Amino acid sequence: MTFIKQMMPRYVASMTAGIVAAAMAATCAFAPVANADAVSPTQETIQSTGRHFMVYYRAWRDVTMKGVNTDLPDDNWISMYDIPYGVDVVNIFSYVPSGQEEQAQPFYDKLKSDYAPYLHSRGIKLVRGIDYTGVAVNGFRTFMKEQNKTESEATEADYDAYAKQVIDKYMISVGLDGLDIDMEAHPNDADVKISDNVIRALSKHIGPKSAKPDTTMFLYDTNGSYLNPFKNVAECFDYVAYQQYGSSSDRTARAAADYQPYIGNEFVPGLTFPEEGDMNNRWYDATEPYEESHFYQVASYVREHNLGGMFVYALDRDGRNYDEDLRRIVPSNLLWTKTAIAESEGMALDTAKTAANHYLDRMSLRQVIDDNAASADKARDMVGKAANLYETNKAVLGGDYGEGFSNTYDPTLEAGLLGIDISVLQQQIDKSSEIIGADTAESDAKTALRMARDAAIDGLTGKIYTADQVSAWSQALKAALDATVPVPTPDSTDQNGNRDKVTNHKVQGQPKQLSATGISTDIIVAVGVTLAIAGVALSLSRKLS
């Protein structure tokens, strides 16, 4: 899967290809442009280990939900477009109090129409938790009662029918890919018998035993090592998500050993951030110094022992504290999550520093940088001094939202962009700026050059770009640069009396010229068409980034 396919749904790629075809019909005087098959970093470049990174996304804090499950007046800030790269599973966690369903509906509409297709285009699976006791056990009992039967009379067909009902209600209705059994109880044998059968019935449709193991997912999510509800159906699940909030890697080691006979290394421990309004729990997972934090310990343990991955709960609360933040909703730069992704995936410190400097270099092309509280030079200095991944990322992002060079820098995404060579384009931008600034006189050629340069800068300072887009911007700039060198016009009288031959040759062999400039109008048209096409591709990709 190419990088562009992760960024944009198929319909965007088709639209771009259609625009390219239309432009080619109008003129052939331009270079190949961005398309869905761009040569660019693959998913393997971004996340090559096969380990998972899951985030719990609290739906009631999405920008589309207002006043749901909250008594705080603050506006929500996060959307699913903010989910960092390197995440491959999003667990949608939602509680909608009775009477607030109408206020919550915009999120579920957006999820199905926009969020899910976008995240799918990035290779991300979407799952939703269902309560073990409420759905996997008592839900089935209620289902049987509605048919005037007891649980002891249940047949495989009954379990299959109930499983389809659960999948339709919790998964298909909102465009998701799987379910997560949230087990935080100690069920008795009768309950386990029911849940075993419900889980087996669900596994016919989702997860590793289904007919679609690559496009669906079935998870078991728990906070302990009570194995009775799990051991008989372990093969039905993709992995175990283990809530070890407030605990170091010592607990990871013990719990992973408990589950290893049943699930192997497909064990995914998780940590949490402080939730607003929680006046009781104090987990302190994300605390400096970084290398003493639970985040560093668990991410390192996952990497070193090749476990199934890692997860974080309450993505939007990344970086929050147990003081004033318990009573407010404020934006986050997602520093801890982005670092945990890189740490658990084994990103080398040198790679992290190269990615950070790459980002600073390309963002410095902007004449005005809107969101920086620190200069690029200061950030570069801090990157150079950084001793670990956290310090490297913090050098660019800052310790909290609004404190760094950028609020949105994504180290995993940037590491993927390192595979696209932008050096030639950067040289062309420098050369163009030199020519544009050489004198104040404006001309058609300079206007075209400015347009091409600004489009290239706009593209390179976006969130993401492809190799084909870089090629398009580069070739448009080359055409514009060439157009600033006038084509010599032969004298009106030829010394050898060959005026007619020269004129005829000029008419037949030279492109049309702009009056009094000697600049090819074909080149100017080519620059405009190339930039128009590259610009469309850019605007579409930005819309979804």
From Swiss-Prot:
Known role: Endoglycosidase with broad specificity that cleaves the chitobiose core of high mannose and complex N-linked glycans. Is able to release N-glycans from diverse host glycoproteins such as human and bovine lactoferrin, immunoglobulins A and G, and ribonuclease B. Is active directly on human breast milk - a complex matrix of lipids, oligosaccharides, and proteins with disparate glycosylation types - successfully removing a significant proportion of the total amount of N-glycans. Does not recognize O-linked glycans or free human milk oligosaccharides (HMO).
Active site per the UniProt annotation: E184 (proton donor)
Subcellular location: Cell membrane
Organism name: Bifidobacterium longum subsp. infantis (strain ATCC 15697 / DSM 20088 / JCM 1222 / NCTC 11817 / S12)
Keyword 4Fe-4S: no
Membrane spanning stretches: 518-538
Name the record gives this protein: Endo-beta-N-acetylglucosaminidase
pH curve summary: Optimum pH is 5.0.
Coiled-coil regions listed in the entry: none
Gene Ontology biological process terms from the UniProt entry: carbohydrate metabolic process; protein deglycosylation involved in glycoprotein catabolic process
